[in-house]
């Protein structure tokens, strides 16, 4: 048998073939609606040497899959057969006998039974789109990134960061990092047992185990893994039985030198309705904040995404997106996807003007125009200084530091240039503004209290 070829067996065959694995993974990753829209009518034709050939029903579907999903599809094929180097997608009429499509059952993670969860098919719960390679690193997330990478690459059973606790707002990259850890381990150390799931699903599985009298099986499954990652731990707040089970699972894994990674929307100390003994343990290892994006980070994320999708977006449109979509990465990428989809559907090139028109409703619903004056008032009030101190030449630390913070927030939350920001602070030179921003960014790397303070001010200003 030629090992470079993918062999499609009859669907009644018990063996699992590569194409069915790939389609199942696409279904798991993207969900039923998107799978049915783009992948369900794609057929496997053949493999020759290092190339797989697929067939799409229309040129439009072929081009759309090529632009958005070709990298993911290739990575999935390579996971099952690393000899594959390229995936080609063609369009042509096919006799029914040559078509290999897959009817997939509608199944959510919550429907998976304990026997399946005990199997080695844990890989399918990791989203191949979320890797370390496509995670854009900047000042707001570099500590979390470095810690997550250290966990994934650790040559020992556990890293020095155990447990690793990632916290921050919605859509800032916590889940991306957790998937990246799992994906990296399964690629580079496939013998290690890794489970990732949300706290909600952890609770669901626990309740199901209680109902079916399978508690011992549940305990064995979760307490025998090498790496356990629980997303959105705040979900178990106020749920006493689930907290009790999580507490004992946590203790068992830590005592046995197994790695834990936890994510949350707030720091351990800010969790309400959760036992103090759990709060304490969540802070045992490294607590890393994934805080709000900077303009530069948003710009980097957009440029990386555009390169992955192989589309042309003019610089002024990219700048517009980075300046206006400030809430989180998820919304930023969603806005970019909307602009690109509109361009593909209408066959119109992307311009600043049509970007503004396409996103008008989104921006209007989110609209909260923040001015430099708003920021100055908020910061002056927070630090109990006069508003006039923002534009004064006084250099006392109690005045200079709040002024630097206000300059930093003005750069993050407004589209103003450094020159324009300087004018609002007593006609200061743009180099003074640059120095202030750099100073605050340096402080944010080591001063957790300041980081939380600035995050809070940003949320208040944005809402």
Swiss-Prot record:
Ranges where the record places region Domain II: 84-124
Stretch list, region Domain IV, binds dsDNA: 344-463
Region annotation (Domain III, AAA+ region) ranges: 125-343
Binding-site residues, ATP: 171, 173-175
Keywords (A to Z) from UniProt: ATP-binding, Cytoplasm, DNA replication, DNA-binding, Lipid-binding, Nucleotide-binding
Oligomer status and interactors: Oligomerizes as a right-handed, spiral filament on DNA at oriC.
Protein name per Swiss-Prot or TrEMBL: Chromosomal replication initiator protein DnaA
Organism: Rickettsia bellii (strain OSU 85-389)
């Amino acid at each position: 048998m030629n090992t470079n070829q993918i062999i499609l067996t009859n669907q009644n065959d018990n063996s699992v073939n590569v194409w069915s694995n790939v389609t199942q993974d696409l279904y798991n990753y993207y969900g039923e609606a998107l799978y049915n829209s783009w992948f369900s009518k794609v057929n496997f034709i053949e493999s020759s040497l290092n190339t797989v050939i697929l067939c799409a029903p229309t040129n439009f579907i072929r081009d759309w899959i090529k632009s958005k999903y070709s990298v993911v599809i290739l990575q999935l094929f390579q996971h099952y057969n690393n000899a594959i180097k390229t995936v080609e997608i063609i369009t042509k009429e096919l006799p029914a006998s040559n078509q290999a499509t897959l009817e997939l059952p509608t199944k959510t993670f919550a429907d998976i039974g304990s026997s399946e969860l005990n199997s080695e098919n844990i890989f399918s719960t990791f989203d191949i789109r979320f890797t370390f390679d496509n995670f854009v690193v900047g000042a707001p997330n570099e500590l979390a990134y470095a810690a997550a990478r250290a966990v994934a690459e650790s040559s020992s059973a556990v890293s020095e960061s155990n447990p690793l606790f990632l916290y921050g707002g919605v859509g800032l990259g916590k889940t991306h990092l957790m998937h990246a850890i799992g994906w990296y381990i399964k690629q580079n150390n496939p013998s290690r047992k890794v489970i990732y799931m949300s706290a909600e699903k952890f609770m669901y599985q626990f309740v199901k185990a209680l109902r079916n009298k399978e508690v011992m099986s549940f305990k064995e499954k979760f307490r025998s893994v090498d790496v356990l990652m629980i997303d959105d731990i705040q979900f178990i707040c106020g749920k006493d039985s689930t907290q009790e089970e999580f507490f004992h699972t946590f203790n068992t894994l830590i005592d046995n030198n197994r790695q834990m990674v936890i994510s949350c929307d707030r720091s351990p100390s800010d969790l309400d309705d959760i036992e103090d003994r759990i709060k304490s343990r969540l802070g045992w290892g490294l607590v890393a904040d994934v805080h709000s994006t900077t303009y530069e980070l948003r710009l980097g994320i957009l440029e990386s995404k555009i390169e992955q999708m192989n589309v042309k977006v003019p610089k002024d449109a990219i700048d517009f997106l980075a300046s206006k979509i400030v809430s989180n990465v998820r919304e930023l990428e969603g806005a970019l996807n909307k602009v690109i989809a509109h361009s593909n559907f209408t066959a119109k090139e992307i311009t600043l003007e049509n970007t503004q028109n396409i996103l008008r409703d989104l921006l209007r619903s989110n609209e909260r125009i923040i001015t430099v004056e708003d920021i100055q008032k908020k910061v002056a009030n927070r630090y109990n200084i006069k508003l006039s101190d923002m534009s004064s030449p006084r250099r006392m630390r109690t005045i200079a530091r709040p002024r630097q913070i206000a300059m930093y927030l003005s750069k993050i939350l407004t589209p103003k240039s450094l020159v324009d920001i300087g004018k609002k602070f007593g006609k200061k030179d743009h180099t003074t503004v640059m120095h202030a921003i750099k100073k605050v960014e340096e402080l944010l790397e080591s001063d957790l209290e300041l980081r939380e303070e600035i995050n809070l001010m940003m949320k208040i200003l944005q809402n």
